[in-house]
Amino acid sequence: MTITCPKLKPVICLKSLIFSVVIFPLCSLAIGESLPSIPDIDYKLIDNFSAGDNSKLWVPMPGSQPVEVINHSGHRVLRLPCNFKGNLIKRASWDKNYKLDLSMCKGVQFLFYCPHSAPAATFNIYFHSGKGWYSASFSPQTHKGWSHITILKKNTRIEDKPAGWSRIDRIRISAWRSLDEDTEFYLAGLGFYGSGSPVTVVRADAYAQRNFRTDVTVSRFVGVMDDFLNRAGIDHLILSDQDIKAAKLKETSLLILPYNSNMPEAAVNEVAAYLQGGGKLLACYTLPIKLQRLAGIHIDELIKQKYDGFFASIRPAKDPLVGMPVVTEQASWIINSTKPIQGRSRVAAWWYDNKGASTDFPAILVSNNCVFFSHVLLADDSSNKQRLLLAMMGNLVPGLWQQAGRGRLDQIGHFGPYRDYAAAVAGIRGLAYRNRSVLTKLESAASFHTEAESHFQKQDYTQTILCAENAQKNLLEAFCMVQKSTPGEQRVFWCHNAFGVEGMTWDEAVKVLAENGFSAILTNMLWGGAAFYPSELLPAAPKAKEKGDQMKLCLTACQKYHLQCHVWKVNYNMGWPTPDEFVNKMKALGRTQVTYDQTARERWLCPSHPDNQKLEIESMLEVARKYTVQGLHFDYIRYPARDGCFCDGCRERFEIFLGRKINRWPQDVRSDPEINKKWLDFRRRQIDYVVKEVSHRAKQIRPGIKISAAVFPNWPTDRDAVGQDWQKWCKNGWLDFVCPMDYTASNWEFRHMIEKQRTWAGAVPCYPGIGLSSSKWSDPTDIIKLIEQINITREMNTGGFTIFNYGLIEAEHILPRLGMGITRNPDNYK
């Protein structure tokens, strides 16, 4: 019997799910102490662990101990012991066979308790389907009681080739090792999470399975669509294209294809059946020919932008969508050209360039059952983009306007510590201390809130949404204004783009940072095989010659506005900027990496090759010699993963290090514990050498220069996994500050990562990396989450923080709001 998703009332998700977490303790509870009381379970269960002998049904992986079933508070609870002490297992893990159809659910939920979580680096849940897995990490929100964990399908990673959420045949629970200490954790109430939504978003899982890049791309654009729908208050479900069945879509009033390249034929046929049955479709960028015919539109060919800013905005046609903005900005680089079919579809919007001229390319086509947008939805201009999306949806399903209006009203004031409008007003007013500017913002919010309610009663939902957004904007800005600034701390932004912020000069971009109280920028000016300034060692990156010496432009601006300039290098990874000629040369010379299975990793330089070490060192020292920078910053100063590098040169150099030949290469490196231990030490030494040499020699060249590194967050495991022994770098004085990449949306987890990292860093300042625009944050404009994590760094006395990544959204929307309060420091700008 297959267990399928019930029709449930959606539950608000605790936004604690992330893809990579590190768990740390705050308690000293002894293992085996009495369990806290279990909270009420008000959701449909998949498994209450009462059927059969769960101590045997949950099968431990080799090296793990059996589970124990406990009766507690009227519930059956799993106790899962993690025997890490003196045990070489990488994880404690258990499997149980199921037969589940989770296709029409949003995910699963369960109760989790771990009194001492430090020995576990991460907790993971896996769902087996076909020939692959869906996986997700999770973290507890407290050590004192049970955490309600929600695993959303949309946030899971794909491993190998799963066959869809309708074919789940096994669940695995794992705790990955961090410390040589035993612990245990408990599970109760494994259940379904959410189903029965009027809007269904189709995720291109079949395409995502091709490789890591396609998975990231699919996740990105599904994430943007999901975020806009959440902000609009539109209840929706994300469905795998491997699970589409027209029969399952009977309650779906609108199907959305956010980015569905190479849709499987079976899925195309099911969507076609859905349309033929009267369904409505919103599609972005691509659409199979069969569906084009049913939708009454025609797609011609891909059109790349003729110049930067060619596709800059979307503007209404003569017969536009009701409620669409006059101008919606979107910096697209490519579109699919489209044509309406006479009598069946029309152009509702056109693409305009950054000078305000029409490109004569349609942006939106509309038919009686379909709206087609000729590119994917991007996250820029989020307020107008959300209204544009609602206009496209409302054209097909008018009832969604009312739902969105009500949703936006209910969201006013629901942010940070506040649950509704009244709580937000009261809380902010209590922090205002008669600040007239803050009180004025609150008055404006009240006025817009009243107008929004009035428009809703009049069924004018477009104005309801507009007024609700303005009310929320004023409340958010009032909240930003009451935040306290801490003078003297290091406030740093990573900037991955060597040309700075798109649409701004380096002078303009640096000025925004300085005006809003930031003290330093880490700017990515060189990679493993490319430089964005005249270099005698590295080839010029694309457009570097055309656009000039970016290092000089950035440094000049930093000197003008008194901002520290630290130059960031992507080490070993040649990446996208490196010319193919240089990559091919490195490969021919045997200087690129080879994985354990002897697959070429052509764009990664081998860290043990002496010439590569010399290139890494000398290229960074070249910057210190040529430019009066305040610092040099390492990134990717590691191996990509455990499976590298196993080239012939690595074998030769490792055998010299080992003092003998290896009979079976590379098998003995993993199968022989003693050789493996030496191998891990060998890898670390290659990375250590580069850090030490750059640190010592750069300070001889430019006394006072600061050396820093962006590092993985969990030193005890990462020193083995990727050869990054950053505690040693701090202890030996090779680093002047360290920036662990603590990219998580969980404040609890963020806090406990920092607690451990400060210990590992010792006397070296630790400026935690906040992942504002990383894939771990669902919303890159979440100023509230950013403020919360900045405040956590202050509570932990780090003396500073580092934010990823400085771009246009950060310049236009994030920095001005930070500068209103939490980073307000006029002395930083002279």
Positions of the model-derived regions?
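Catalytic beta-strand/loop cores that center a nucleophilic Ser/Cys/Thr
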Residues: 56-60, 90, 310-383
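Substrate-binding cleft of secreted/luminal carbohydrate-active enzymes
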Residues: 734-750, 757, 764-830
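Extracellular ligand-binding/catalytic regions of CAZymes and related secreted enzymes
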Residues: 196-200, 224-228, 357-482, 815, ...
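A glycine-rich, often tryptophan-bearing local segment used as a flexible ligand/cofactor-contacting loop or short
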Residues: 261-334, 343-347, 354
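Active-site-adjacent "subsite" loops/lids of carbohydrate-active enzymes
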Residues: 488-492, 566-627
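Extracellular ligand-binding interfaces
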Residues: 82-162, 167, 176-186, 191-193, ...
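Helical hinge/lid and interdomain linker segments adjacent to catalytic or ligand-binding clefts
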Residues: 211-295
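Short carbohydrate-recognition loop motifs
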Residues: 65-90
